[in-house]
Amino acid sequence: MVEGIGDEFQRSTKHSRERLLGGRLDWANKPETYKEYPSARKVPLPRNFPSSTLSFLEAVKKRKSVRSFFPEPLSLGDLAFLLWASTGIQRAEQGYEFRTVPSAGALYPIETYVIVNNVGGLEKGVYHYNILAYSLEELKNGDFGEEMAHAALEQKICAAAPVVLVWTAVFNRSKWKYAQRAYRYVYLDAGHIAQNLALSATSIGLGSCQIGAFFDEEVNQILGVDGVEESVLYLSVVGHPR
């Protein structure tokens, strides 16, 4: 088999006894942990989370990829719960805010965007989850479902589901400490978040499907990110399973 860029990536980002990737930490230039759109309209998120009738074991047993949804809106409360459970702030200790998922070095390079197709109390559009302010920031108004489906290799569930969650990485948050090995960690971080999302959705009777097939730059354009400093990694649709 002919080697390619993936093989080189795996080889070049290995630790060895002779070489640990990373370097001296430049605390004066540590990247910001949180992203915010100061001029965007903020939608406060409710904290009265839905109750789950499933145990953790039952949620694990029932989780599956769902690709067909009823045309029912998602409630804002359900969306708020999913956002918090997937990557919200769980506790504060020693000056750090820790989240519901692990992250290499507690650097949290992943940002969450929401393509709203059908959520009670929200206009259709593109939103950013402001974790620190526990709110949604409205970035664009309009119906982006078909555009997302087109960008996701014509996967129509991106238009049919009430929401599409889009996870991006702000790479320098991790590269600041881990240099090139950070690229391994950001993908792991996205996976942690996606699994939390999948189990949380199952626990309240919703379904999800994680999506890794998409045209990166088309999704980046929908979000308004540059694809260099910040770029899409992963998607998930969520809705009421048929």
Q: Can you say where each PLM-predicted feature lies in the sequence?
A:
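Short pre-catalytic strand/loop immediately N-terminal to key active-site residues, enriched for Gly-Thr
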Residues: 181-189
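N-terminal accessory segments that position/regulate proteins before the catalytic core
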Residues: 1-167, 171-172, 213-242
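Structured binding elements
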Residues: 205
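Active-site cores enriched in adjacent His and Asp/Glu residues with nearby glycine-rich loops
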Residues: 208-210
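Short acidic/His/Gly/Ser-rich catalytic and metal-binding motifs that mark active-site loops
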Residues: 173-177
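C-terminal substrate/ligand-recognition segments
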Residues: 194
